[in-house]
Amino acid sequence: MGVQVETISPGDGRTFPKRGQTCVVHYTGMLEDGKKFDSSRDRNKPFKFTLGKQEVIRGWEEGVAQMSVGQRAKLIISSDYAYGATGHPGIIPPHATLVFDVELLKLE
């Protein structure tokens, strides 16, 4: 499957991230059953990553690249675009499909 992007609320429709830019996002990560495992919103601190530097899972690289600034979307990411057969011990089980609620706040 890879990554599926479902818009929750639209962005500006013009400003999309490019490789090398820093994406500033708020997110909540959940397992398919809705169990939350991480959230920048709970910490009240946006998360930053550089697109194209493999600092995040492949599903984020490809999913966030399709979002415009201000957009909030649900990213449904298959395990091969996330943590695969290994998972993340104690947090994400092996072969888990992940669901992220991501808002692209700005680009730097």
UniProtKB/Swiss-Prot annotation:
Top enzyme category: isomerase
Topology in membrane: Peripheral membrane protein
Molecular function per GO: FK506 binding; identical protein binding; peptidyl-prolyl cis-trans isomerase activity; transmembrane transporter binding
PPIase FKBP-type domain mapped to chain residues: 20-108
Sites bearing N6-succinyllysine, chain numbering: K53
InterPro entries with a match to the protein in the record: FKBP-type_PPIase (IPR050689), PPIase_dom_sf (IPR046357), PPIase_FKBP_dom (IPR001179)
Swiss-Prot/TrEMBL catalytic activity: [protein]-peptidylproline (omega=180) = [protein]-peptidylproline (omega=0)
PROSITE patterns listed in its UniProt record: FKBP_PPIASE
Keyword Acetylation: yes
Keyword Acetylation assigned: yes
EC number, UniProt record: 5.2.1.8
N6-acetyllysine carried by residues: K53
Subcellular location: Cytoplasm, Cytosol; Sarcoplasmic reticulum membrane
GO CC annotation terms, alphabetical: cytoplasmic side of membrane; cytosol; membrane; ryanodine receptor complex; sarcoplasmic reticulum; sarcoplasmic reticulum membrane; synapse
Regulation: Inhibited by both FK506 and rapamycin.
Domain of life: Eukaryota
Signal peptide (residue range): none
GO biological process, one term: release of sequestered calcium ion into cytosol
UniProt keyword list: Acetylation, Cytoplasm, Isomerase, Membrane, Rotamase, Sarcoplasmic reticulum
Function, in words: Keeps in an inactive conformation TGFBR1, the TGF-beta type I serine/threonine kinase receptor, preventing TGF-beta receptor activation in absence of ligand. Recruits SMAD7 to ACVR1B which prevents the association of SMAD2 and SMAD3 with the activin receptor complex, thereby blocking the activin signal. May modulate the RYR1 calcium channel activity. PPIases accelerate the folding of proteins. It catalyzes the cis-trans isomerization of proline imidic peptide bonds in oligopeptides.
Family per similarity comment: Belongs to the FKBP-type PPIase family. FKBP1 subfamily.
Subunit structure, interactors included: Interacts with TGFBR1; prevents TGFBR1 phosphorylation by TGFBR2 and stabilizes it in the inactive conformation. Interacts with ACVR1B and SMAD7. Identified in a complex composed of RYR1, PDE4D, PKA, FKBP1A and protein phosphatase 1 (PP1). Interacts directly with RYR2 and RYR3. Interacts directly with RYR1. Interacts with GLMN; rapamycin and FK506 abolish the interaction with GLMN in a dose dependent manner.
Official protein name in the record: Peptidyl-prolyl cis-trans isomerase FKBP1A
Lineage: Eukaryota, Metazoa, Chordata, Craniata, Vertebrata
Gene from which this protein is expressed: Fkbp1a
